[in-house]
């Protein structure tokens, strides 16, 4: 290790907790992981963290659709996401959630500091409101035409075509995504972050030279058009953190989402019992390095709002943003109908993780260019590079070493100068990994692989093996081939973790960047086993077909209670608190003359009797069986006069009706009159 060890904190953008991880997500997580693994190989202290972005109206509404709580949904999604990332060997030190105690505390702290420093403004705004659903519409639940570039079907907060941000009220011909209705305007008090106050600081940060040229140029466009105050609040109903001392107002998801980076790191420090690192990494004058790997669609939030929030609350700013482009498949946007919208979990059923890691890495650079996953080219490149050039180099030599020399390598290198050529390449390849010029690194490595294979071709160990008296030559040639293979795999270790583990088992030696100067001499390797299998287009065809089938299954009509009886519009806690539910003992139950649907129930509320008519006769043909049973009733429902008498409440039951009605009963131990909360 010739460099000074650095402290580095690396993050990926937080996946939203309402959907599965797909190959578009994986580009970023693979890119970051390759960079992190290289940094660790060079001896740096790296903390690699991520979390699920778990707040917002989309999560609230999807949970309602599924008939579960948002907490349950994001918990299940977190497990799925972590399983997918583990399957691709993404080496996170911690994976957390923005719906956490750490994130709440830090969000409130940053907001409070911003407010105390005069950067939070209050004002009443006119906001889009869905008259059919009775709710204010968050940015992402309004679509219309972008007011800047006039692109159609854009969300209410930013345009995915030109990258502009704006207020949903600026959209041309807006429509509610929830109901399709044309929204109306209503007034509401909102909280704003005074972004323009940080314009000078942000422009200086932009001119520092650290940012990618494309990012800096885009930021300059935003400065020229003028920074606007940023609305950081949303009205109830909303799934997120309530703003301190502002009932019914919640932090906008984009306020607490990047703070999730801090929350995840704080959670990691707490798990380790580390009471100092959080401040060391996040204090204003920290000498640790902080890097965010993000997609080009969220540059605005990370390059303007996030550093301004940190500056205004006396935390450190990012060292840099590493921005990448989108993923296309076979030259086009990922498509569910064509089977190219591929989930991470589906990929792993047909290919290993290393194959995609390699292909993405071979195409990545430090620029913000889109990456095309051409599936035919993918098969050809994996077979040509990993199998034919790298793994084949080992297999061509290992057999002779195992069979003829009991696995022991030669005591000297056959060609020390050639070996030095390979180890000297560490500087160029290392710089390519460091600067995220991944494609260049792969090209350099594969050029060396060609040289190594040419050496074996020229030395022809299969010919030497048949010649008497040349055992020493055979051992030297094959040992040289294996040592060159070892150097190549050391360079590839950040990209191919699974293959690297197999190679280390075969070599009986760890692939260590700083150890390549010393070749393996008189060293015993283990029996060679197949390291990597060829792939073919049949696997691709099966993958695409499986993706199509998943789309069909997801699009199949939903059946069951939720489909027949969709969840009603959201109510507030105050609305629910008006309903007084009580445990009631059924003292008597009888038929009602003149009605084939009703039963007359006499209910004891623990000192008060109620007469209730209930339409449950078809499900309970023997009313006497209900006597002595406890149920739950709405005790404060206004009495209703019927021709059979006055009904003084309502008993609670589940089911669609007819014979499928099921009275609700409390657990044993509940007493008549107790309130149900």
Curated annotation (Swiss-Prot):
A motif ('KMSKS' region) lies at residues 333-337. GO terms for molecular function: ATP binding; metal ion binding; methionine-tRNA ligase activity; tRNA binding. GO terms for cellular component: cytosol. Residues 575-677 form the tRNA-binding domain. It catalyses: tRNA(Met) + L-methionine + ATP = L-methionyl-tRNA(Met) + AMP + diphosphate. Keywords: Aminoacyl-tRNA synthetase, ATP-binding, Cytoplasm, Ligase, Metal-binding, Nucleotide-binding, Protein biosynthesis, RNA-binding, tRNA-binding, Zinc. It is found in: Cytoplasm. Its cofactor is Zn(2+). Pfam families: Anticodon_3, tRNA-synt_1g, tRNA_bind. ATP binds at residue 336. The keyword Acetylation does not apply. Gene3D superfamilies: HUPs (3.40.50.620), Isoleucyl-tRNA Synthetase, Domain 1 (1.10.730.10), Methionyl-tRNA synthetase, Zn-domain (2.20.28.20), Nucleic acid-binding proteins (2.40.50.140). A motif ('HIGH' region) lies at residues 15-25. It is an enzyme of class 6 (ligase). Its EC number is 6.1.1.10. Zn(2+) binds at residues 146, 149, 159, 162. One of its GO terms (biological process) is methionyl-tRNA aminoacylation. It comes from the Bacteria. Binds 1 zinc ion per subunit. Is required not only for elongation of protein synthesis but also for the initiation of all mRNA translation through initiator tRNA(fMet) aminoacylation. Homodimer. PANTHER family: METHIONINE--TRNA LIGASE, METHIONINE--TRNA LIGASE, CYTOPLASMIC. NCBIfam families: metG (TIGR00398), metG_C_term (TIGR00399), PRK00133.1 (NF001100). Belongs to the class-I aminoacyl-tRNA synthetase family. MetG type 1 subfamily. This is Methionine--tRNA ligase. It comes from Salmonella typhi. The gene is metG.
């Amino acid at each position: 290790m010739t460099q000074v060890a650095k402290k580095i904190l690396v993050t990926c953008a937080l996946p939203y907790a309402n959907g599965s991880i797909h190959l578009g997500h994986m580009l970023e997580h693979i890119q970051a992981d390759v960079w992190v693994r290289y940094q660790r190989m060079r001896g740096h202290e790296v903390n690699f963290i991520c979390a699920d972005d778990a707040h917002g109206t989309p999560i609230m509404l999807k949970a309602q659709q599924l008939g579960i709580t948002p907490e349950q949904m994001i918990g299940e999604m977190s497990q799925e996401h972590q399983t997918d990332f583990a399957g691709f060997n993404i080496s996170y030190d911690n994976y957390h959630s923005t719906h956490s105690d750490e994130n709440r505390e830090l969000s409130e702290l940053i907001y409070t500091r911003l407010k105390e420093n005069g950067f939070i403004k209050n004002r009443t705004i006119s906001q889009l409101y869905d008259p059919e659903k009775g709710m204010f519409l968050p940015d992402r639940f309004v679509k219309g035409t972008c007011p800047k570039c006039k692109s159609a079907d854009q969300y209410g907060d930013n345009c995915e075509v030109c990258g502009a941000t704006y207020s949903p009220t600026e959209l041309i011909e807006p429509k509610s995504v929830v109901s399709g209705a044309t929204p109306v305007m209503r007034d509401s008090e909102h909280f704003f972050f005074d972004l323009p106050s940080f314009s000078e600081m942000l422009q200086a940060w932009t001119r520092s030279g650290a940012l990618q040229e494309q990012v800096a140029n885009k930021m300059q466009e935003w400065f020229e058009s003028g920074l606007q105050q940023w609305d950081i609040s949303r009205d109830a109903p909303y799934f997120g953190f309530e703003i301190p001392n502002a009932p019914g107002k919640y932090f906008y998801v984009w306020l607490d989402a990047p703070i999730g980076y801090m929350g995840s790191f704080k959670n990691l420090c707490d798990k380790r019992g580390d009471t100092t690192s959080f401040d060391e990494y996040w204090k204003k004058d920290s000498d640790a390095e902080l890097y965010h790997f993000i997609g080009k669609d969220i540059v605005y939030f990370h390059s303007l709002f996030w550093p301004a929030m940190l500056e205004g609350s006396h935390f450190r700013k990012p060292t840099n943003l590493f921005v990448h482009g989108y993923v296309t498949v076979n030259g086009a946007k990922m498509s569910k109908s064509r089977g190219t919208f591929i989930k991470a979990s589906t990929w792993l059923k047909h290919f290993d993780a290393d194959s995609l890691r390699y292909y993405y890495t071979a195409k990545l650079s430090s620029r913000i260019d889109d990456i095309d996953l051409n599936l035919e080219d993918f098969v050809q490149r994996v077979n040509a590079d990993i199998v034919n050039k790298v793994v084949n180099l080992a297999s061509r030599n290992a057999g002779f070493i195992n069979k003829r020399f009991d696995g022991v390598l030669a005591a000297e290198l056959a060609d020390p100068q050639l070996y030095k050529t390979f180890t000297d390449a560490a500087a160029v390849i290392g710089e390519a990994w460091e600067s995220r010029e991944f494609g260049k690194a792969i090209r350099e490595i594969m050029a060396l692989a060609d040289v190594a294979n040419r050496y074996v071709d020229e030395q022809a160990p299969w010919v030497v093996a048949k010649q008497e008296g040349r055992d020493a030559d055979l051992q030297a040639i094959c040992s040289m081939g294996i040592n060159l293979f070892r150097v190549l795999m050391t360079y590839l270790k950040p990209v191919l973790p699974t293959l690297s583990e197999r190679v280390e088992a075969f070599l009986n030696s760890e692939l260590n960047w700083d150890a390549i100067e010393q070749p393996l001499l008189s060293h015993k390797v283990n029996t060679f086993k197949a390291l990597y299998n060829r792939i073919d287009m049949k696997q691709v065809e099966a993958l695409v077909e499986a993706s199509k089938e998943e789309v069909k299954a997801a699009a199949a009509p939903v059946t069951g209670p939720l489909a027949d009886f969709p969840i009603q519009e959201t109510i507030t806690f105050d609305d629910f608190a008006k309903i007084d539910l009580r445990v009631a003992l059924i003292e008597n139950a009888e038929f009602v003359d003149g009605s084939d649907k009703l039963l007359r129930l006499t209910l004891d509320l623990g000192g008060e009797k109620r007469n209730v008519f209930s339409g449950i006769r078809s499900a309970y043909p023997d009313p006497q069986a209900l006597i002595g049973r406890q149920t739950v009733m709405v005790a404060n429902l206004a009495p209703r006069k019927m021709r059979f008498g006055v009904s003084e409440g309502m008993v609670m039951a589940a089911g669609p009706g007819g014979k499928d009605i099921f009275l609700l009963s409390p657990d044993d131990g509940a007493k008549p009159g107790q309130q149900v909360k």
